[in-house]
Design a protein with these regions (language model features):
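N-terminal helix-loop segment corresponding to the beta1-alpha1 unit
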Residues: 2-230, 234-240, 419, 426-449
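A glycine-rich dinucleotide-binding beta-alpha-beta segment and adjacent secondary-structure elements
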Residues: 360-414
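Aromatic-enriched alpha-helical interface/lid elements that frame and gate functional surfaces
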Residues: 285-361, 365
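Oxidoreductase and adenylate-handling cofactor-binding alpha/beta cores
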Residues: 224-245, 257-270, 311-318
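Flexible, small-/acidic-enriched active-site or ligand-binding loops
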Residues: 42, 326, 394-441
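Glycine-rich beta-alpha junction loops
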Residues: 81, 178-179, 251-256, 294, ...
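Conserved Rossmann-fold dehydrogenase catalytic segment
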Residues: 180, 208-216, 239-255, 271-282, ...
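A short glycine-threonine-serine/GTX helix/turn-capping micro-motif
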Residues: 211-222, 244-246, 277-287, 296-298, ...
């Protein structure tokens, strides 16, 4: 509930606060309360760490992008002609502007979302030469992240057992749908299937409607985040042991962990969950999105004090002492009646009018914004969450920035998402010592691109 409140307060900037936010936005290095001003030239914490990224789509690339944001060198291995699967997951695509003919219509928005701060090499490991190159890269790297089906890399001698002998200090992270063990371990796992299998879809959607998936692939994203944390922990452990280890991260496990209080409620009571609640809360009322005169607004009368504020701002102070609504338990009991009353009042004014009425009240509230409204939101922009960078083939592109702010470092978009094979020559020459003629020969054999 606290996260909803925090997000609500963030989203509720009204016209009166815009000038303040604008002034803050003009001071990107403003001193934090109680903390020295950021020294933005300090080295990023993962500078000097090299990651061999053998992942594609979303969960694995989310992990490696986080590591890249924090300063690691990410070498992304892609199929020499197809590249990452998401390169073809357009439209929308960012059109090429450099006049070079390519097999793609542009760089897909999907691919652009999770591949900044990486180098791309086009490399096939369907032949011994490609495998040998990957072995050499593994020797030079601190971390390897892959997201292939369990056991499928063994025939290429790229499994953990083989790679750990080549480089015992390497942290090897495997991201799969259902993990390396268990009865479902051989299943392919995409986000939607795991949302369905592991309970999330069942609790998502309107009360009397069929289950729906979450609007963004949260299981993939949370798995990428958990895997990044696992990699950091393994690197920290390596400082004492000198040894890497195998990280087994699965969408299924991370999704179960993400059920949080809902899973805990079932474990504590031994009873079935309470099902889908739409934007409402199973045990707190009023706490949901309601219709206004023009769009929708979310409000949180999450305790007696906040409920009282809501009643007064709605012009209905008598609801505070209504015997049906005196406590949260009673408000939950009479949910349908109270929700209908609240929505009837909210529909008398526009969302913007309510935002101005609720301003400064201390009650959580937020306009329900679409994505265009979000990426152009005054607070999002003031927090530098959207950054425009120069792409080598597409001109300028806006990307979502790294979300965590630090007092002494500044993770940022150092390089845009790479073109397929953009860094093949650089990596082979500078890191592995290949000569120009050797690389040309590998290209002729379609081992590299």
């Amino acid at each position: 509930m606290s996260s909803f409140g925090a997000l609500s307060r963030v989203a509720a900037c009204s016209a009166r606060s815009r000038s303040v936010v604008g002034r803050l936005a003009a001071q990107p290095h403003r001193q934090w309360r109680g903390i020295a001003t950021k020294q933005v030239n300090e080295k990023l914490p993962l500078a000097g760490i090299r990651v061999l990224d053998m992942t594609r789509v979303l969960a694995g690339p989310t992990c490696t992008q986080i590591l890249g944001d924090l300063g690691a060198e990410i070498i992304k291995v892609e199929h020499p002609t197809r590249g990452d699967d998401t390169r073809s997951w357009g439209p929308p695509d960012l059109a090429y502007t450099d006049g070079v003919e390519r097999s793609f219509p542009g760089e897909s928005a999907y691919y652009l979302s999770v591949n900044r701060n990486k180098k791309s090499i086009g490399l096939s490991f369907n032949n011994p030469e490609g495998i040998a190159i990957l072995h050499k890269l593994a020797q030079k790297c601190d971390v390897l992240v892959e997201n292939y089906l369990p056991g499928s890399l063994k025939k290429y001698q790229l499994d953990y057992e083989t790679i750990s002998k080549i480089n015992p200090s390497l942290v090897y992270a495997s991201v799969t749908g259902y993990g390396q063990t268990g009865p479902y371990s051989d299943r392919a796992g995409y986000d939607v299937m795991v949302e369905a299998e592991m309970g999330l879809m069942h609790i998502t959607g309107e009360r009397d409607r069929p289950p729906v998936k979450v609007g963004v692939a949260v299981t993939d994203i949370s798995t990428g985040m958990y895997t990044a944390i696992g990699v950091l922990a393994a690197l920290y452990s390596r400082r004492d042991t000198g040894l890497g280890q195998w990280i087994d991260a699965s969408l299924s496990d991370c999704q179960v962990a993400g059920l949080a209080n809902i899973a805990s409620s079932v474990l504590v009571t031994g009873k079935k969950d309470s099902g889908r609640w739409g934007t409402a809360h199973a045990t707190v009322v009023p706490y949901r999105a309601y219709k206004t005169k023009d769009t929708n607004i979310a409000v949180g009368g999450c305790n007696d004090k906040l409920y009282g504020i809501l009643c007064r701002k709605l012009g209905k102070p008598e609801w505070i002492t209504d015997e049906r609504f005196i406590t949260n338990a009673l408000r939950v009991k009479h949910r349908e009646v109270l929700d209908a009353m609240v929505e009837a009042e909210l529909q008398l004014r526009t969302t913007q009018e309510w935002l101005e009425i609720f301003e400064g009240s201390g009650m959580p509230y937020a306009a329900v914004n679409d994505i265009q409204g979000t990426v152009n939101h005054e607070h999002v922009l003031a927090r530098n969450m959207i950054e425009e960078v120069a792409h080598p083939a597409c001109g300028k592109v806006k990307l979502v920035n790294h979300p965590v702010k630090y007092s002494r470092i500044e993770p940022k978009i150092r390089t845009p998402p790479p073109l397929l094979g953009q860094h093949t020559d650089e990596v082979l020459k500078e890191l592995l010592g290949f000569e120009e003629g050797e690389i040309s020969g590998l290209r002729e054999k379609k081992t590299v691109a």
